[in-house]
Structures are given as C-alpha cells and as structure tokens.
Regions:
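Alpha-to-beta junction loops
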Residues: 21-22, 58-59, 76-85, 126-128, ...
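Extracytoplasmic small-molecule ligand-binding "clamshell" domains
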Residues: 3-86, 91, 225, 234
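Periplasmic-binding protein-like
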Residues: 27-28, 102-113, 175, 179-220, ...
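A ligand-binding cleft/hinge motif common to bilobed small-molecule-binding domains
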Residues: 69, 86-94, 140, 164-196
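Flexible hinge/capping segments at coil-to-helix
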Residues: 110-129
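Ligand-binding clefts/hinges and TM-proximal coupling segments of bilobed small-molecule sensing domains
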Residues: 2-6, 11, 136-153, 190-191, ...
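Ligand-binding cleft/hinge of the Venus flytrap
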Residues: 32-38, 49-59, 98-99, 123-125, ...
C-alpha cells in the first residue's frame, strides 16, 4: 500500500470520479487549538484515512462534525463518504460497518484525592460518572452500571468541566482521550484497568453496500500489512491496539 492504486472498481467508482474521499471525524477525534484555530487530528486516524485515499488514488478530505449522531446523518445524507466509529448495535440500523480497525480501552479519569482506584470502585450509589451522550464508551457503560449515575454532556470539553467543577466523580471515555485531559487537572489520574473497549470500525451509509465491501477489504489488508500498526506507533497513544483480523484462519 506504499503507492497509490488507481482503482477500476465499480464499488467505488463514484469516489474515483469525484477525485476525493470525504472522511468524517467527530469530537474528540480531532481538536482545535483555542488560540490559533489549527485542527489536530488523531494520528492513527489520519494515517489510516490517508492509506485509504492512496489505495483509491484520490484526494483525502477531512470533514468535522460535533457528534457521532451528526456523522451518521452526514453519511446517510451523502455529505460525507466514510467515518471512523465504534460498531455499536444501536448504530447498526443506521450505517454499515467494516470489521474493526482499532481497539481502544475504556476507563475513568478521576480527580485528585479520589477514593476510586479501580473500575469496580465507581459503581456505587451516589457516584456520578460524566459521559458524552451517544458516544460508544457511554453506550457500553450504560449496559454495565448497576448503582452509579451517569451525568451527560454533548461533547468532551463540557464533560471534562463536569469533573473539573465537582459535578461528577469520574469521567468515562477512551483512555488516551482522558490522558490528554488529565494534564489540565492537576493531581488527576487515569485508572489502569478498563471497563471495555471500543472496536473502532469504518462506517458508510447503508445504501452503499459495494463501498462497504471495498472498505472492509481495505481494513483487513491494512491490518495484515502493518499499516494500522504503523499508524498507532506514529501516534504514540496508550491503550490503542490493532483490532484482531476478521477471519483469523485466513491469516498466514
């Protein structure tokens, strides 16, 4: 996959004709510098998106959305072509998913002095856990908790503010996202254990079955060839792994 591959493939002929693939990202897959406004995209996503564009032989265009729900709307409206998204059963009726590309650990960020040391410590009456509404990490946690209360915000920054201002006792999300925010809250800790993992796949509109088949092939090729592992290494993030192959028996 080191060289561009011009594709004479009917499954993605529309993308080749357009000369670009529009990859949608949602917060916190990208961030804006508050001073310069410069966009920073998670390296592992950017590198994998570039590899897809190279395989297609087209330009890569990154589009910004605030939430996963807005990305799904964009996919089905045709305003974007592909996205990276956790393959949750609640989303499967709206978009089509490739096999997983990445596996991302879910855990908690807790403030200085917190008595929460392990995941199990947080599931108690009276404990408030901040979450981003409709994120895969939230959907997973909502199925696991028996006693703690979820406190919702729409995007990562206001979710962090719930923790920072004492309106929540922990924040549940992807580990490397929490690591970045931890630097903004002195004494805070990201727990070492996890309550699950995000199997991050590539998503397309349900109406594009051919495109999905093509992208699923790309994903398996990228995992097997080391492209995904190299993208992870370039990003240097903790708690991020290459997802297992979709068909382990086919790997040599």
């Amino acid at each position: 996959m080191a060289e561009a591959q011009q594709v004479a493939d009917s499954r993605v002929a529309d993308l080749v004709r357009a000369g670009k693939v529009r990859v949608a990202l949602f917060l916190p897959q990208y961030a804006k510098d508050p001073v310069t406004g410069e966009r920073r995209v998670d390296v592992h996503l950017m590198e994998t998106a570039r590899a897809l564009a190279m395989r297609l032989g087209v330009e890569l265009q990154i589009l910004e959305y605030p939430t996963p729900s807005k990305v799904m709307e964009g996919l089905n409206a045709g305003t974007c072509d592909v996205a990276f998204m956790g393959n949750e059963s609640s989303r499967a009726g709206e978009v089509g998913f490739s096999s997983p590309v990445f596996e991302l650990d879910y855990t908690y960020l807790v403030p200085a002095g917190s008595s929460i040391r392990r995941i199990a410590d947080a599931d108690r009456p009276g404990i408030r856990i901040a979450v981003v509404r409709n994120h895969a990490s939230t959907l997973t946690l909502s199925r696991l908790l028996k006693h703690a209360e979820l406190v919702y915000a729409e995007t990562p920054d206001p979710t962090f503010d719930l923790l920072r201002t004492g309106r929540a006792d922990a924040w549940a999300s992807v580990g490397f996202v929490l690591q970045a925010y931890s630097a903004r809250l002195p004494g805070s800790r990201v727990l070492e254990d996890r309550y699950g993992a995000n199997l991050l796949a590539m998503a397309v509109a349900k109406s594009h079955a051919g495109r999905l088949a093509y992208i699923s092939e790309f994903v398996e090729e990228a995992k097997a060839s080391g492209v995904v592992q190299q993208a992870i290494e370039r990003g240097g993030l903790r708690g991020l792994h290459v997802a297992p192959p979709a068909n382990p028996g086919a790997q040599k």
